[in-house]
Amino acid sequence: MTLLNYYSQTKMAKGERFGYKTAILHLAPYKLSGKNVCPNASKACATACLNTSGRGQMNSVQDARINKTNACWKDRLQFLKDLDAEIKQLSKRADAAGFKFAVRLNGTSDLPWHRYKLDGQNLMQLNPDVQFYDYTKVFNYLDHGVKNYYVVYSHLSLIHISEP
């Protein structure tokens, strides 16, 4: 299963003007897969979610996002190994084309990737020449201490989705 979308979206292709090839990981947001990957989701966030924009409207895309989310939950260690291998492969491809490489792991999720370890290191530490970036609604994610991980705090709506 391919985990990352590699410069296949219009927004990501714009990064080439700045010397970057980019990849993004799309999981099934909020609780769409049965697992909550957006811990601080508000009604406004869930309503405005980009999950179904563009190609995201297609059933096959939604199924793939659910499958990736389930794979991440079922065997996180294997998921991290697969993700790391894909990052390394795409980074080499970007480098060979004369580009830097950037990865957004929370395309349609808000998980603490800086806390998930593989051989004692997170994905950012395993790939120091790759620039990672994300948006988050979890303020504590800003204090991660990883040099090549840029996180932007996104304002949290005061209206939260009520739990059943």
Which stretches of residues belong to each language-model region?
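Acidic, His- and aromatic-enriched active-site or binding-groove loops in soluble protein domains
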Residues: 125-137, 153-156
